[in-house]
Regions:
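N-terminal regions of ATP-driven nucleic-acid and macromolecular assemblies
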Residues: 1-100, 105-217
Length: 217
């Protein structure tokens, strides 16, 4: 179900938590979900990004495009079972060898998600679970709903699509109010930015390693 909340004027929660969750609002929003998921890593972190997903999921929704990460190597790990996916995520997070570990995982229990959060803290990295919905219990500190928005107007041709846009809803959080933000992909910098700031000169990026607002994509 799409959010009825207006776009928030509050700052976007840029810096990722050790463990987050995000789901697509509708099946057609899976590409937007993956774009958002891959963005939850700090700018300047050159460690690889790992994606663990069932083979059936990859066959249905496609494989992430590694060069779109803007320099970070992509490790794609097809799995068969939820247990296998959770094991891969936990080992990757605990190792500290990756900047981000994303798992298309359904049905993770509260205990399993707590193990992932603990592993992420141990490894100094970020984990993101991408279930079908947010109905279950989870240790994730932020839980998001992602939907696709009409693209921006192309600056050189109003008949052509411009930069991809997505709406992100913070549905649940520890210590933060729910909110909705519009983000936009910058294809030149491989970054997601707040869409309403792109017209400004020198807009801040979302999720920087130095703690300033910024978010890698």
């Amino acid at each position: 179900m799409a959010s009825a909340l207006p776009v928030s004027s509050r700052p976007f929660p840029a810096r990722p938590e050790p463990l987050e969750e995000a789901c697509a609002v509708a099946p057609g929003d899976m590409a937007a979900l993956m774009l958002f998921a891959l963005s939850r890593r700090l700018e300047g972190d050159t460690r690889p990004v790992l994606v663990a997903a069932p083979r059936a999921w990859l066959g249905e929704h496609g494989r992430p495009y590694g060069p779109g990460l803007g320099g970070s190597p992509l490790i794609l790990t097809p799995v068969t079972t939820v247990a296998e996916a959770l094991w891969v995520l936990e080992q990757a997070l605990r190792s500290g060898a990756v900047s981000l570990a994303v798992g298309a995982v359904d049905g993770a229990t509260l205990t399993q998600s707590r193990r992932l959060e603990f592993a992420a803290k141990q490894g100094g990295t970020t984990g993101l679970i991408a279930p079908r919905d947010l109905n279950g219990l989870s240790a994730a500190r932020r839980r998001w709903r992602i939907s696709t928005e009409p693209s921006a107007i192309h600056p050189d041709d109003v008949r052509s699509p411009g930069r991809a846009r997505l709406k992100v809803e913070l549905a649940r959080s520890r210590g933060e109010r729910p909110g909705v933000w519009m983000l936009e992909q910058d294809d030149e910098t491989h970054r997601l930015r707040l869409a309403d700031r792109l017209a400004d000169l020198g807009p801040p990026s979302v999720g920087r390693a130095d703690g300033r607002p910024g978010l890698a994509a």
